[in-house]
Amino acid sequence: MANVYDWFEERLEIQAIAEDVTSKYVPPHVNIFYCLGGITLVCFLIQFATGFAMTFYYKPTVAEAYSSVQYIMNEVNFGWLIRSIHRWSASMMVLMMILHVFRVYLTGGFKKPRELTWVSGVILAVITVSFGVTGYSLPWDQVGYWAVKIVSGVPEAIPVVGVLISDLLRGGSSVGQATLTRYYSAHTFVLPWLIAVFMLFHFLMIRKQGISGPL
């Protein structure tokens, strides 16, 4: 095993990377509230794992979406647990994200030179809410259907482009199969890629600039 490690160490400099990661200075004023962002990340990883597991059984059609969710809950081994964890973790992720935003704002973490970290965080917050909106509709039950109908109808109040935005969200003039397909695609492909990119940027900025000082 030592020879294998030495082979990788010679090429990747694993020890140097490990020392750089573990030797970062942590200011003495840091407390448990500075962990809220990390907890949000953990919730996202749980979301990713449980959501990925459910894609093996979920059917994104208006005729089969609800029955496939019932199948996950009642027939799939531990399916009820996986979906329940997905729902609980979603709520926890939103809560931790809100608390994290408040912590950063109240401690002045958005000030120079961390403006871009703050902006990327706000974008991540918008993406997180978008996850909630798109995921809420996927069971295609009464609650999900009417939630989509209301959300997709709100932009119609915008002058000139409102109807165009609503039609884009619905995939047409009314809520139907095209709507569910778009929300499923956004929830499982578009939004995960977006949040991964902005998370990487967010963490790199934190790594580069360090944790903000006390007020």
UniProtKB/Swiss-Prot annotation:
<dbReference type="InterPro" id="IPR005797">
    <property type="entry name" value="Cyt_b/b6_N"/>
</dbReference>
<keyword id="KW-0793">Thylakoid</keyword>
<dbReference type="GO" id="GO:0022904">
    <property type="term" value="P:respiratory electron transport chain"/>
</dbReference>
<keyword id="KW-0472">Membrane</keyword>
<protein>
    <recommendedName>
        <fullName>Cytochrome b6</fullName>
    </recommendedName>
</protein>
<keyword id="KW-1133">Transmembrane helix</keyword>
<feature type="binding site" description="covalent">
    <location>
        <position position="35"/>
    </location>
    <ligand>
        <name>heme c</name>
    </ligand>
</feature>
<comment type="function">
    <text>Component of the cytochrome b6-f complex, which mediates electron transfer between photosystem II (PSII) and photosystem I (PSI), cyclic electron flow around PSI, and state transitions.</text>
</comment>
<feature type="binding site" description="axial binding residue">
    <location>
        <position position="86"/>
    </location>
    <ligand>
        <name>heme b 2</name>
    </ligand>
</feature>
<keyword id="KW-0408">Iron</keyword>
<feature type="transmembrane region" description="Helical">
    <location>
        <begin position="32"/>
        <end position="52"/>
    </location>
</feature>
<dbReference type="Pfam" id="PF00033">
    <property type="entry name" value="Cytochrome_B"/>
</dbReference>
<comment type="similarity">
    <text>Belongs to the cytochrome b family. PetB subfamily.</text>
</comment>
<keyword id="KW-0479">Metal-binding</keyword>
<feature type="transmembrane region" description="Helical">
    <location>
        <begin position="90"/>
        <end position="110"/>
    </location>
</feature>
<dbReference type="InterPro" id="IPR027387">
    <property type="entry name" value="Cytb/b6-like_sf"/>
</dbReference>
<feature type="binding site" description="axial binding residue">
    <location>
        <position position="187"/>
    </location>
    <ligand>
        <name>heme b 2</name>
    </ligand>
</feature>
<keyword id="KW-0602">Photosynthesis</keyword>
<keyword id="KW-0812">Transmembrane</keyword>
<dbReference type="GO" id="GO:0046872">
    <property type="term" value="F:metal ion binding"/>
</dbReference>
<dbReference type="GO" id="GO:0015979">
    <property type="term" value="P:photosynthesis"/>
</dbReference>
<feature type="transmembrane region" description="Helical">
    <location>
        <begin position="186"/>
        <end position="206"/>
    </location>
</feature>
<dbReference type="GO" id="GO:0016491">
    <property type="term" value="F:oxidoreductase activity"/>
</dbReference>
<dbReference type="InterPro" id="IPR048259">
    <property type="entry name" value="Cytochrome_b_N_euk/bac"/>
</dbReference>
<feature type="binding site" description="axial binding residue">
    <location>
        <position position="202"/>
    </location>
    <ligand>
        <name>heme b 1</name>
    </ligand>
</feature>
<dbReference type="InterPro" id="IPR016174">
    <property type="entry name" value="Di-haem_cyt_TM"/>
</dbReference>
<feature type="binding site" description="axial binding residue">
    <location>
        <position position="100"/>
    </location>
    <ligand>
        <name>heme b 1</name>
    </ligand>
</feature>
<feature type="transmembrane region" description="Helical">
    <location>
        <begin position="116"/>
        <end position="136"/>
    </location>
</feature>
<keyword id="KW-0349">Heme</keyword>
<comment type="subunit">
    <text>The 4 large subunits of the cytochrome b6-f complex are cytochrome b6, subunit IV (17 kDa polypeptide, PetD), cytochrome f and the Rieske protein, while the 4 small subunits are PetG, PetL, PetM and PetN. The complex functions as a dimer.</text>
</comment>
<dbReference type="GO" id="GO:0031676">
    <property type="term" value="C:plasma membrane-derived thylakoid membrane"/>
</dbReference>
<keyword id="KW-0813">Transport</keyword>
<dbReference type="GO" id="GO:0045158">
    <property type="term" value="F:electron transporter, transferring electrons within cytochrome b6/f complex of photosystem II activity"/>
</dbReference>
<keyword id="KW-0249">Electron transport</keyword>
<dbReference type="InterPro" id="IPR023530">
    <property type="entry name" value="Cyt_B6_PetB"/>
</dbReference>
